[in-house]
UniProtKB/Swiss-Prot annotation:
GO terms for cellular component: extracellular region. It comes from the Eukaryota. Keywords: Disulfide bond, Hemostasis impairing toxin, Platelet aggregation inhibiting toxin, Secreted, Toxin. It is found in: Secreted. One of its GO terms (molecular function) is toxin activity. Its main location: secreted. It comes from Bothrops alternatus (Urutu). Disulfide bonds join C2-C13. Residues 1-25 form the C-type lectin domain. This is Snaclec bothroalternin subunit alpha/beta.
């Protein structure tokens, strides 16, 4: 599961930092 402030897309969790996105499994 993703942290509550992260989003999920196609099975990957990601979090937006301003204009940057950090992708994580």
């Amino acid at each position: 599961d993703c942290p509550s402030d992260w989003s999920n897309h196609e099975g990957h969790c990601y979090r937006v930092f301003n204009e940057w996105m950090n992708w994580a499994d």
